[in-house]
Amino acid sequence: MTQITQIKTSAKNKELVTQLTRKFALGTENVIARIAIAYSLRNGIRFKPTDVKDAGGKEYNKNVLFGNLFPLYLSMICAHYNIKDTNKDLPRYFKMHLDDGLERIDRDVKDNPNLFGFDYLFD
């Protein structure tokens, strides 16, 4: 398995993490990050490893970000890209989906300010 110890958002998305967490009253900032990754994957976009943005933003330790759910998120990324859990680009895919999901949620909120965090948990 590829070693993943931390994931950072882009510098631009550092503030989004705080804003969205506050707007949705989610408690800790890792909750919006988990939702963002899943939301990005749900939208079906497939990134190239070279699409990665800067990493000057919010830093998450793997255990803080995923808790005991890391195997689930790892499986979702691997299935989405049809790759093994030894793929060297896994950290990039996690980061890109984190950034993409945050940006998508932010656009959604701008289009519909009445959204709740639970809107992203149910389809």
Where are these regions (language model features)?
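Surface-exposed, Lys/Arg-rich phosphate-binding patches that contact polyanionic backbones
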Residues: 3, 10-31, 35, 60-62, ...
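Short, surface-exposed loop and linker segments with low hydrophobicity and enrichment for Pro/Ser/Thr
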Residues: 26-28, 64-66, 89-91
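Short, basic amphipathic alpha-helical segments that act as recognition/interaction helices
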Residues: 27-51, 106
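N-proximal short alpha-helices
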Residues: 2-6, 71
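Low-complexity intrinsically disordered segments
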Residues: 80-123
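Short, positively charged interaction helices/loops
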Residues: 42-85
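Short runs of predominantly hydrophobic/aromatic residues within well-ordered alpha helices
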Residues: 13, 29-32, 37, 69-74, ...
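Membrane-topology and secretion signals of cell-surface/extracellular proteins
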Residues: 15-20, 31, 40, 46-47, ...
